[in-house]
């Protein structure tokens, strides 16, 4: 089970990151988006949360 999970992560995570870089050249890298979302504490304001979600998903 652990080996299967390790292989899955080793194969899919780099693929997702590479695809993110390839399709978002000149934009904020997806990894930085995820890091920013995890660092910024959730707030009661709807605006910043919606903005962060939009940026993270690549929608404009």
UniProtKB/Swiss-Prot annotation:
Kindly provide the name given to this protein in its UniProt entry: Protein K12
């Amino acid at each position: 089970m652990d080996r299967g999970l390790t292989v899955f992560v080793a194969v899919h995570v780099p693929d997702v990151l590479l695809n993110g870089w390839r399709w978002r050249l000149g934009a904020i890298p997806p990894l930085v988006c995820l890091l920013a979302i995890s660092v910024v504490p959730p707030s009661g304001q709807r605006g910043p949360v919606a903005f962060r979600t939009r940026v993270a998903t690549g929608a404009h």
